[in-house]
């Protein structure tokens, strides 16, 4: 019986990782995957590592690890390794892949001389980054949890917490992102403010949809893009993902559908 192994992402697994497991699903997923893989490669020198779990030669899960200073998802901190996302195929859960990936992340953190590992965990029944799993792996919730308020995400996620595992007692606690968005109107225009990052497949994919839909409206709509992949942008606005139309946030949790984006812009135009 094949056993679970872990490796760094390579040419044989980058398609699985880049498409967030949506292999051979659509041209859109493939295009998104290419953008993400390019970003992964560019970030390698800054400490990004993608760990892949395999059963035999079949990839079944992955984990992203990077210095917290360059992580586009939060939390904010220093001298820690951030794990913004860990995923294991549903049919392969409970077999040790997730724990094996966490063990690799710990090795990577020590290899890079970090004082610990930090992640965002959620207390809910949804699959994304369950806090209970990280606690079973030895992570501790730092301070109090807080309610998820982002439009769309709050439909799936309830309370979020910063969880960390410390190797060095001098490690400084990371901090929650605190969104700092202020709408700036432009006379006679509908303004779309897009906060996104290339790292997250969901954010990456919906950002491209927003660009395409906004282009349909020509000069009537102004698009402002804010990429959380730039640490300075993330620290200024502290929003890794969000779509605002004339200051009002829209969201679905999953990738914003084109029809939904189009309808929201049309309603704003009609209102004005």
Where are these regions (language model features)?
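C-terminal "cap" of GNAT-fold acetyltransferases
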Residues: 147-181
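Conserved acetyl-CoA binding element of GNAT-fold acetyltransferases
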Residues: 74-90
């Amino acid at each position: 019986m094949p056993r679970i192994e872990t490796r760094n992402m390579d040419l044989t697994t980058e398609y699985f990782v880049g498409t967030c497991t949506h292999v051979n699903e659509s041209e859109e997923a493939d295009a998104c995957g290419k953008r993400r893989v390019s970003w992964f490669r560019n970030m390698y020198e800054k400490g990004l590592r993608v760990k892949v779990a395999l059963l035999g030669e079949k990839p079944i899960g992955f984990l992203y690890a990077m210095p917290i200073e360059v992580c586009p998802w939060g939390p904010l901190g220093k001298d820690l390794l951030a794990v913004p996302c860990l995923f294991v195929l549903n049919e392969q859960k409970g077999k040790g892949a997730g724990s094996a990936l966490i063990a690799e992340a710990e090795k990577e953190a020590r290899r890079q001389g970090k004082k610990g590992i930090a992640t965002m965990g959620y207390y809910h029944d949804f699959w994304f980054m369950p806090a209970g799993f990280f606690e079973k792996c030895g992570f501790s919730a730092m301070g109090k949890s807080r309610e998820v308020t982002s439009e769309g995400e709050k439909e799936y996620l309830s309370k979020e917490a910063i969880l960390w595992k410390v190797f060095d007692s001098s490690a400084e606690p990371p901090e929650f992102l605190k969104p700092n968005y202020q709408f700036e109107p432009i006379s006679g225009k509908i303004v779309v403010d897009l906060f996104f990052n290339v790292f997250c497949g969901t954010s990456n994919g919906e950002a491209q949809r927003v660009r395409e839909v906004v282009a349909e409206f020509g000069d009537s709509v102004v698009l402002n893009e804010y990429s959380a992949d730039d640490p300075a942008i993330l620290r200024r606005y502290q929003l890794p993902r969000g779509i605002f139309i004339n200051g009002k946030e829209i969201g679905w949790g999953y990738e914003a559908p084109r029809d939904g984006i189009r309808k929201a812009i049309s309603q704003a135009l009609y209102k004005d």
